[in-house]
């Protein structure tokens, strides 16, 4: 088993190797060419300065990783020591089991012998048989639930008015009362004595209107002077304005060619 100082030294060596890998080692560096090595050198040089925010964040992360590495060293060493102790205990237990394998297996007390048949007295002492003297339970019976009745309800149970006051009920609509049969005078005005005895001296005759005048075109033109004005709100029509049907004949047309002159 390694001593504590030796483990501390090994841990520090591992931490220094990790830090060398992070910061870079000029001795063991693979030559990757100018396109890779020069930008990497520029990037590492920029990160080494604390002029920009990215470099400051990079330094903070480096310090945090170093702090985590050295602070967790004590916890990891304790865990490793506990693991080694557990491994030694397991080895000792294995040696003890090998040495005691020739002894008889340990059985807990009050365990029945599996070679003998089971005895009811041993399994459940005091049990003689099924309980035949006790009547069986009756199922499918309606159980009446018991409810609590307060002393106030018991005191006013004989007084219905108090019960109604204790448990208010909703109001029910009352029936409509029958309206009295009054005589209505809201009628058409009638002359005294009725229409038969009314005076017939004044007679009104509805004048006769000549409805033909309303349809007279002269009256319509006079009533609407804009009716004779030309309207341009018309639908588009074809080349033939009179809507004459076109007749297509299959007979050969006559040769109406114009004779050419001598100049042509």
Swiss-Prot record:
Origin superkingdom: Eukaryota
Phosphoserine: residues bearing it: 101, 116
GO CC annotation terms, alphabetical: actin cytoskeleton; Z disc
Residues with PTM Omega-N-methylarginine: 53
Subcellular location: Cytoplasm, Myofibril, Sarcomere, Z line
GO molecular function: actin binding; FATZ binding; telethonin binding
One GO biological process term: skeletal muscle tissue development
Keywords on record: Cytoplasm, Methylation, Phosphoprotein
Annotated positions of the Phosphothreonine modification: 107, 111
Oligomer status and interactors: Interacts via its C-terminus with spectrin repeats 3 and 4 of ACTN2. Interacts with ACTN1, LDB3, MYOT and PPP3CA.
Stated family: Belongs to the myozenin family.
Stated role: Myozenins may serve as intracellular binding proteins involved in linking Z line proteins such as alpha-actinin, gamma-filamin, TCAP/telethonin, LDB3/ZASP and localizing calcineurin signaling to the sarcomere. Plays an important role in the modulation of calcineurin signaling. May play a role in myofibrillogenesis.
Protein name according to UniProt: Myozenin-2
